[in-house]
Amino acid sequence: LQIIIMVLFNVKELYISWFVGAEAVVDYQIYYKLIGMIGGLFSLALNPVWSAVTKALVEKKEQWIRGLYRKGIGLIALFGLAQLVLVAVMPMVVKLWLGENAIEVSRVAGLLFCVYNLVYMWMMLNYNFACGMGRTKVISIWLTVAGAGNLLLTMWGCSVYRSWITVVVATAVAAI
């Protein structure tokens, strides 16, 4: 399962390099390092969830599982708001970070990256709960289809738009 998730979410740089051009990876990395860090923190916070859900399921604590899931959704909403604040100040942050080498920040690309990141966090929350409940077969089929869909959407989208953000959007759409 970890390999399937890696293929779905960690091949964007490779796809950008193949379908858009290696120079576009630099722009993607700036957005990823700033906005993607929020999804990374959320994913890190999920580390104990899988085993906690398994334990609660064995102990027949369905209400506790539902409550934990609602808290996860609430955390996604909170992180989503943090992303919006980050997108608002991102031009200033990038200029401070990179100085005169700074890229021109696109708020549209930033917002699309936020949507991708929300989908990523939602998917990781559901992944951890599904695995904790022993639904690994269902999740592995779903992730495999999403991985194939991601490649197809990326190929089509980049043939039309030739932008790194197309790869990010394709990944979000495929993961839904």
What are these regions (language model features)?
Residues 6, 33-36, 71, 117, ...:
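Residue-level recognition of pore/gate-forming positions within transmembrane alpha-helices
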Residues 29, 61-77, 85-89, 107-110:
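Interfacial transmembrane-helix starts/ends
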Residues 35, 39-60, 69, 129-132:
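Helix-loop junctions and terminal segments of transmembrane helices
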Residues 22-23, 62-63, 88-118, 165:
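Interfacial segments at transmembrane-helix termini and the short loops linking adjacent helices
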Residues 1-51, 116, 120-124:
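Transmembrane helical elements of multi-pass membrane transporters/channels
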Residues 134-137, 144-176:
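Membrane-interface helix-loop junctions in multi-pass transport and translocation proteins
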Residues 114-145, 161:
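Membrane-interface junctions at transmembrane-helix termini in multi-pass inner-membrane proteins
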Residues 35, 39, 79-87, 120, ...:
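Alpha-helical transmembrane segments of multipass membrane proteins
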